Structures are given as C-alpha cells and as structure tokens.
Amino acid sequence: MAHKKGVGSSRNGRDSNPKYLGVKIFGGQAIEAGNIIVRQRGTQFHPGSGVGLGRDHTLFALVDGKVEFSVKGAKKRRTVSVVSVEA
C-alpha cells in the first residue's frame, strides 16, 4: 500500500509575456530619428528610405520626418519610409 497520497501534476500552467508587436507610428504621422515605427516578427514590413532594420526586425526612423507606407515591386512588398519635411 502507498503511504503517501499520489498527487497528479498538470502539464499546463505556463504562459509567455505579451510582446506588444505591431505598428507604433502610422502613415502621415511625424516621427523623430530613433523612434520605433513597427515591431514585428520577420519582415512583414520592409525598410525604405530613412528607415533602419533592427536585429529583431524592428523598423525605426533614421531621420526626422513623416512616415509613409507603400507597396512596391512585383512581390508587392510593404515598405515603410520616412520622408523628411522641409521647415
């Protein structure tokens, strides 16, 4: 006979923290250099002029200006550019 009561164990009970992905600055909005435009997994959006690509595929502004989203090329790639606004 068992001297301890058998205790079942659940294989659930885990959850990952939210990653807060998505577009942070939308088309037509003003942005400063260094600000994040899109947080993404993989390149759903590709960097255009004035936009850098981070190690985790984050798109960020390299210059001050306005954000512009467009679809380019035969592959219909969605690109993000920052157009500098002349004062």
UniProtKB/Swiss-Prot annotation:
GO terms for cellular component: cytosolic large ribosomal subunit. Gene3D superfamilies: 2.40.50.100. Keywords: Ribonucleoprotein, Ribosomal protein. InterPro entries: Ribosomal_bL27 (IPR001684), Ribosomal_bL27_CS (IPR018261). It comes from the Bacteria. GO terms for biological process: translation. One of its GO terms (molecular function) is structural constituent of ribosome. The keyword Ribosomal protein applies. Belongs to the bacterial ribosomal protein bL27 family. PANTHER family: LARGE RIBOSOMAL SUBUNIT PROTEIN BL27M, RIBOSOMAL PROTEIN L27. NCBIfam families: L27. This is Large ribosomal subunit protein bL27.
